[in-house]
C-alpha cells in the first residue's frame, strides 16, 4: 500500500501534467521559478480560506458560481445536444434559488459556513466530472415538479391548444 506522501506526489504529478496544457501557466512557471502546481494550490488555498472565513465570501462564491458554469452554458448554446442543456438549465435554476433564498433570509447570518456549503454545492453541480445538476434534476426537480411541465399538462400547452382551436375554426 502506497504511503500518503507517495499518493500526494502522484496527485501533484498528475495535476502538473494537466496544468502543462496551459501556456500561460508554463510561462508563469518559467518566469517565477515556482512550480505551477504550487501556484495553483496556493491560490486555491487562499480562495478557500477567504470563503471559509467569509472574507468577501459572497462575492467569491458568486464569482465561482458564474465563471465556470457561464463558460459551459455558452458552450451548450452552440451545441445541438440536449443533455448539456438540461445540465446547465438545472444548474442556473438551483443557483438562482440559492441566491434568492440567501438574500431573503440573510443565510450567512443564520447558517454558519453557509458560503462553504454553497461553494461545495456549486462546484459539485457545475464540474463536468460530477454533473451534480443532472443528479438534482433527476432526483428532485423532475419527480417533484415534472407533473406541472409535461406536454399533457394544461398549463404547459394551453397556448398550443388555443392556437389549434383557432385554426380549426
Curated annotation (Swiss-Prot):
Extent of the signal sequence: none
Top-level taxon in the UniProt lineage: Eukaryota
Written domain comment of the UniProt record: The short lumenal loops between transmembrane domains 1 and 2 and between transmembrane domains 3 and 4 may impart a wedge-like configuration, thus deforming membranes.
Sorted UniProt keywords: Endoplasmic reticulum, Golgi apparatus, Membrane, Transmembrane, Transmembrane helix
Chief site of localization: endoplasmic reticulum
Job description of the protein: Required to generate and maintain the structure of the tubular endoplasmic reticulum network and the vacuole. Induces high curvature in membranes and causes membrane tubule formation. Involved in membrane/vesicle trafficking.
Phylogenetic classification of the source organism: Eukaryota, Fungi, Dikarya, Ascomycota, Pezizomycotina
Cell compartment(s), UniProt: Endoplasmic reticulum membrane; Golgi apparatus membrane
Assembly behavior: Oligomer.
Membrane-topology descriptor: Multi-pass membrane protein
Stated family: Belongs to the DP1 family.
InterPro entries linked: TB2_DP1_HVA22 (IPR004345)
Residues exposed to the Cytoplasmic side: 1-35, 77-86, 125-169
Lumenal side: 56, 104-105
Ranges that cross the membrane: 36-55, 57-76, 87-103, 106-124
Cellular component, GO annotation: endoplasmic reticulum membrane; Golgi membrane
Entry protein name: Protein yop1
Gene for this chain: yop1
Keyword ATP-binding included in the entry's annotation: no
Amino acid at each position: 500500500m502506497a504511503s500518503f506522501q507517495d499518493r500526494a506526489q502522484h496527485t501533484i504529478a498528475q495535476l502538473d501534467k494537466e496544468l502543462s496544457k496551459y501556456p500561460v501557466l508554463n510561462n508563469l512557471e518559467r518566469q517565477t521559478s515556482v512550480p505551477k502546481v504550487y501556484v495553483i494550490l496556493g491560490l486555491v488555498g487562499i480562495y478557500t480560506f477567504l470563503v471559509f472565513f467569509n472574507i468577501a465570501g459572497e462575492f467569491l462564491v458568486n464569482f465561482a458560481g458564474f465563471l465556470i458554469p457561464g463558460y459551459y452554458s455558452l458552450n451548450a448554446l452552440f451545441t445541438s445536444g440536449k443533455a448539456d442543456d438540461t445540465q446547465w438549465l438545472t444548474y442556473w435554476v438551483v443557483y438562482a434559488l440559492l441566491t434568492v433564498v440567501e438574500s431573503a433570509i440573510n443565510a450567512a447570518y443564520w447558517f454558519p459556513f453557509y458560503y462553504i456549503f454553497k461553494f461545495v454545492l456549486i462546484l459539485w453541480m457545475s464540474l463536468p466530472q460530477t454533473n451534480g445538476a443532472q443528479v438534482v434534476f433527476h432526483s428532485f426537480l423532475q419527480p417533484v415538479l415534472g407533473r406541472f411541465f409535461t406536454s399533457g399538462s394544461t398549463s404547459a400547452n394551453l397556448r398550443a391548444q388555443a392556437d389549434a382551436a383557432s385554426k380549426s375554426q
